[in-house]
């Protein structure tokens, strides 16, 4: 009789762990993001295509994009984006990402870019293009259009 109880407890524990692994977890995939497009003289530029690109490499295998055009003040606003995935899915995705070796990416990653003709606008901070990697929850960007 004692042997049956042991198997019952093992089965119950495995079932609970599996259930927990399948529960979805919601995390922030991209922040609440405000961006203004300016030219090289810092004048705001309306009507410019601004693209937000984002992906949570630890929870999903495909990236996402949202496009908006800058308003009369040269600005756009992107609402925060959420990713919903189970712990099991996240574990599988992390293992899959790790197979990329030195090129592996993990966690949330987002950035914004402006496009107008042959000009591109990026948020450059300290000489590097800014990319959001999980925090803060709100980002303000200035995208400087430069011809390429």
Say what each PLM segment does.
Residues 8-32, 36-39, 43, 51, ...:
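Beta-strand-rich domain onsets/edges
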Residues 34, 65-67, 75, 123, ...:
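Well-ordered beta-strand positions in beta-sheet-rich domains
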Residues 87-148:
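Beta-strand-rich cores of mature extracytoplasmic or soluble domains
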Residues 1-6:
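Short, Lys/Arg-rich N-terminal segment immediately upstream of the first membrane anchor
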Residues 37-47, 72-73, 116-118:
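A short, structured loop/turn motif at beta-sheet edges
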Residues 22-24, 65-68, 102:
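Beta-strand-rich interaction surfaces with strong enrichment in secreted/lumenal proteins
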């Amino acid at each position: 009789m004692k042997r049956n109880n042991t198997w019952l407890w093992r089965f119950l524990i495995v079932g609970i762990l599996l259930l927990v692994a399948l529960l979805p977890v919601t995390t922030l995939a991209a922040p609440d993001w405000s961006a203004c497009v300016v030219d090289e003289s810092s004048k705001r530029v309306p009507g410019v295509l601004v693209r937000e690109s984002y992906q949570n490499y630890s929870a999903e295998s495909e990236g996402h994009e949202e496009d908006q055009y800058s308003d009369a003040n040269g600005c756009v606003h992107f609402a925060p984006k959420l990713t919903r995935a189970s712990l099991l899915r996240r574990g599988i995705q992390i293992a899959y990402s790790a197979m990329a070796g030195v090129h592996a990416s993990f966690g949330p990653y987002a950035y914004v870019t402006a496009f107008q003709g042959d000009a591109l606008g990026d948020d450059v901070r300290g000489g590097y293009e800014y990319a959001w990697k999980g925090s803060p929850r709100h980002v303000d960007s200035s995208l400087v259009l430069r011809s390429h």
